[in-house]
Each structure stands twice: as C-alpha cells, then as structure tokens.
Amino acid sequence: MQRLTVDEFHEAKKLPLIVVLDDVRSLHNVGSVFRSSDAFRVEAVYLCGITATPPHPEIHKTALGGEDSVDWRYFPTTTEAVAELQKEGVFVYSIEQVEGSTKLQNLSLDTDRRYAVVFGNEVKGVHQEVVDLADGCLEIPQFGTKHSLNVSVTAGIVIWEVAKQFIAGSNTEF
C-alpha cells in the first residue's frame, strides 16, 4: 500500500471530521489520537485546556509524525472550540455516557455535513458545559465490568465508525 507524504496528506481530501480533546492529560493519548487521525485523514484535531500541544517528544513517540500531517489548533477552553465549530455549521457530538445518548452502532450520519467529536479527560470525561453545548452525545456500549475505555481507544473506534459511514456514503475514500 502506497503511503502519502506529509505534503500529499495536506493536499488530500479529508474526512470531514474534527477531533476535539477536552483536557486530555496523557501525552501518550494525545499522540495516539494524532496517529489515528492521520490513519483516517481527519480534517483537524483541536487541543483544548490542559491538553498538551506539539512539538513534544512524548506526543511524537506515539503519534509517529501524525502531529505533523494532521492540522491542529489549540483553544484555551473546549467551549470556545465548540462555539467556533457550531458557528461554522459543524455538528458537534460529545462522546460521553449520558441519559439519552446515541449508541455508536445506531449512528447515522449525513455525508454532506461536517462533524466534530469531543473526547474528555481520562478521569472526569467531557466537561458538563461541553456536553450541554453539544448537538448530541454518542456512547460506545460496553458489556464488561468496566464502565469506560481509554480515551485514545475510544477515539480510534469513533473515528473508524465515522470513516466507515463516509466511505459507504460516497463510494470513494472521502
């Protein structure tokens, strides 16, 4: 399989998805999210609050250069990022276990829209004010003894589900 160069990646058509990290504290998780975002040609990653930003050797260790290929922005607060996205017409989902959330397997996307998905802090999840601002909430059903997944694992699962729907809806690779 032929891989894109970083320059080719920047010019390539992107998955119309922005990944938002809400106070994610682990540099490993930030790097892993960049790596998954690169794999599926995500439009951008928004890093908010205490979330670390590149360049950083610990991010690079897991991102393997994904922090160079995927566009990213920093926002002091996640509410600022969400407000800007919504102003641009982006539909924002918080990834959180809340009453009335949509199970990921029931997600049905309009492939003519842009979306954002907000992933929260490893301990506290997505801030409540961000959940309240979001246009919807998604959750990954879980059937074991634990009630959460690692944030980078969750991001990979959600990004793949969004990518699958766009691939199926367009009969192309974005």
Task: Please place each PLM-identified region on the residue numbering.
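Post-transcriptional modification and biogenesis factors for structured RNAs
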Residues: 1-174
